[in-house]
């Protein structure tokens, strides 16, 4: 029986009932296609198992020498037409406006990418970093399958069912969350790290309730960190409450201001550093001294936490090491596709700084 012919863009167009040009627009510029049409095309791609990169299909059966890393991205800003005044305009931003947040500045991913690059290069591989807006990441993942020998995916970047599907077709490792299906995973001890810093806070905090600034409900890291927090405060006799943030500095400041309208906390434990930095800003605005009136901690170990006023006590994630181990785990999977799945958990450190008071207190 002859081998099954790989599906083509023509097959996708026929299945979806659209033109080839429309399929191309969905793959390259999904925001330019109506939602209903986009869903039909993506459904056809999924049903047929179509890999958009036609040239990459010719590489089947031999190595490319490239590893892929898929990370969350942002919608591209509008591009001014050539020769327009906006092309050379200098923008003035009120940097005292606390609502301004640079979405491109994400220290978490900077360290992770660096670790992946170091490990890939030292192992003789190039690293292809891919990203895209929410609507196109599943297509980007499909495209990566045809371009690389293996893929590293940040948890939540694409739905778990798509990760599980890709793991059946190409070696794949999930970072910052448990893997779906047969994929391997590399993550840190979120619950243990948060439990440790919470114990430290409970032993040193001024009087007042504990406010926990958690993360999004769909964040695996956020869920595990909240578990570690609850493990320590349950039964501690302390009064505590939880507020959810979007893991941004702005979100941390916003939730801190809302909480201050109702309570005067003796401690703020944040699920990430950026939320904690926002909380420091809101506390300062309210005239609440840190650490004398309220202690504050974060989680991640980003460089900005070292230079905040006061310097932020935090749980340091070894994100560079996570990147290194993700690549090494991927290479092991590439060498032995039938090996048992691996869930590697790396330890974290608590960095004690001024936001929790003198170290000897």
Label for each model-derived stretch:
Residues 27-30, 74, 134, 158, ...:
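Short, glycine/serine-rich, charged loops/turns that create anion-binding
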Residues 28, 60, 131, 135, ...:
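Positions that flank functional sites
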Residues 1-66, 70, 360-361:
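N-terminal helix-turn-helix DNA-binding module of bacterial transcription factors
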Residues 1-3, 46-47, 69, 113-123, ...:
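Bacterial carbohydrate/catabolite-sensing allosteric modules
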């Amino acid at each position: 029986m002859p081998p099954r012919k790989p599906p083509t863009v023509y097959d996708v167009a026929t299945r979806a009932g659209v033109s080839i040009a429309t399929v191309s627009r969905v793959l390259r510029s999904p925001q330019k296609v109506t939602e209903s049409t986009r869903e039909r095309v993506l459904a056809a791609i999924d049903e047929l198992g179509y890999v958009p990169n036609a040239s990459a299909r010719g590489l089947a059966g031999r190595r490319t020498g490239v590893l892929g890393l898929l990370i969350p991205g942002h919608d591209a800003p509008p591009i001014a037409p050539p020769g327009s005044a906006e092309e050379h305009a200098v923008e003035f931003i009120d940097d005292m406006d606390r609502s301004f947040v640079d979405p491109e500045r994400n220290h978490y991913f900077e360290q992770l990418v660096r670790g992946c690059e170091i490990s890939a290069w030292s192992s003789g591989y190039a690293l292809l970093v891919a990203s895209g807006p929410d609507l196109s990441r599943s297509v980007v993942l499909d495209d990566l399958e045809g371009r690389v020998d293996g893929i590293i995916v940040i948890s939540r970047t694409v739905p778990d069912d798509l990760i599980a599907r890709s793991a059946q077709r190409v070696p794949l490792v999930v970072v910052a969350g448990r893997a779906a299906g047969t994929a391997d995973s590399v993550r840190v001890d979120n619950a243990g790290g948060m439990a440790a810093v919470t114990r430290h806070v409970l032993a040193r905090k001024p009087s007042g309730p504990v406010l926990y600034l958690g993360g999004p409900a769909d964040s695996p890291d956020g869920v595990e960190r909240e578990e570690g927090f609850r493990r320590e405060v349950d039964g501690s006799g302390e009064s505590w409450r939880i507020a959810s943030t979007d893991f941004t500095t702005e979100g941390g400041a916003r939730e801190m201001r809302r909480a201050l309208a109702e309570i005067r906390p003796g401690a703020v434990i944040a699920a990430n550093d950026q939320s904690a930095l926002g909380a420091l800003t809101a506390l300062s605005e309210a005239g609440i001294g840190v650490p004398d009136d309220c202690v504050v901690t974060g989680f991640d170990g980003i460089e900005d936490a070292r230079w905040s006023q006061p310097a932020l006590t935090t749980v340091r994630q070894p994100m560079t090491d996570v990147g290194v181990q993700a690549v090494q785990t991927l290479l092991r999977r590439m060498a032995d596709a039938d090996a048992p799945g691996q869930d590697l958990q790396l330890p974290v450190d608590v960095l004690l700084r001024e936001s929790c008071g003198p170290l000897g207190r």
